[in-house]
Amino acid sequence: VYISLADNMLYKSGSYEINERAGETLSKIAKIITDYKDYEVLVEGNTDNVPISRTNIRNNWDLSALRASSVVQELQNKYGVDPKRLSAAGRGEYNPITDNDSELGKQRNRRTQIIVTPRLDQFLELIDKAPEAEGEAATE
C-alpha cells in the first residue's frame, strides 16, 4: 500500500506541526495500517528545493525528517499504531516527482509518503507462492 499526501493536508505552512484538518486523513490511514497489522510502515517526508528560512530548522533534510517523525508520532500517540512497526525518514529535496521550476511542481514535491510493506520473511513467502511469469519454464 502506497499513500502520498500533499504537505498542506498535514502541516502548517513551513512547519512540521500537524494541522487540525489532518485528523480525518490520518484516522483513515491508521485504520488501513491497523488492518495490515503484520506489515511495516515507512513514513517519508519530501520537500521542494526552496531553502527553509526558519531559524529552528537547518535545512530541507531536517524539515522532511521532522515532518515524517510528526506523522509517526501522531499515528502512535493519537491512533494507537504500534511504534515497533513505524519508521520515519526524511528525503529532503532529493526525491522529486517533478521539476521545481514552477509553483505547481514545488507543491507536488512537498509531500509525505506512507508505505505499508510486508516484512522480508512475508515478502519471500509471497514470492514463493507467486505463479511463474509467462515464458518462464520451471527447471527440474
Language-model features, listed with the residues they occupy:
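Extended, gly/pro-poor, charged amphipathic helical "stalk/hinge" elements that serve as dimerization
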Residues: 1-10
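Extracytoplasmic beta-rich ectodomain segments of secreted or membrane-anchored proteins
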Residues: 1-2, 21-33
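Periplasmic OmpA-like peptidoglycan-binding domain that tethers envelope proteins to the cell wall
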Residues: 12-24, 36, 46-140
